[in-house]
Amino acid sequence: NNEKLTILSLWATWCVPCIKELDAINEVYEYWKEDIDFELIAVSVDDSRSHRRAQALVNGKEWPYKILLDVNQDFKRALGTSFIPQTLIIKNGKILYQHTGYQPGDENYLFEKLTEYEN
């Protein structure tokens, strides 16, 4: 659904800030869903040697997000990004917001942006 807000989060099992960001969002995810209709897709950029670790990590974390694997990093290259975590908000096929890195509290700003772009 192109009109639905989508958060795309590029991450990897070896990226500590990535895991922290997805854990932080997980803590507030249900509250966010009560206020805003959005989808979160976490795209693992783990390569073919480590993608099994991504699946195991996701199963252990029980993240409610849709998880995709970008084993060849084609999607990451198409976005033109070299760094993770990379978080984007997309609506109607357009990137409305993009952020690289994670500091505790960044998820609050992400929620503000979701609220801003909701309408």
Language model: regions and residue ranges:
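Proline-centered helix-kink/hinge sites
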Residues: 17, 23-27, 66, 85
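Proteins that catalyze or organize thiol-disulfide redox chemistry
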Residues: 3, 26, 31, 109-119
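Short active-site neighborhood of thiol/selenol oxidoreductases, capturing the structured segment around
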Residues: 1-19, 25
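Thiol/disulfide oxidoreductase modules built on the thioredoxin-like
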Residues: 56-63, 71-115
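Structural cue for short, hydrophobic secondary-structure segments
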Residues: 9-11, 42-44, 89
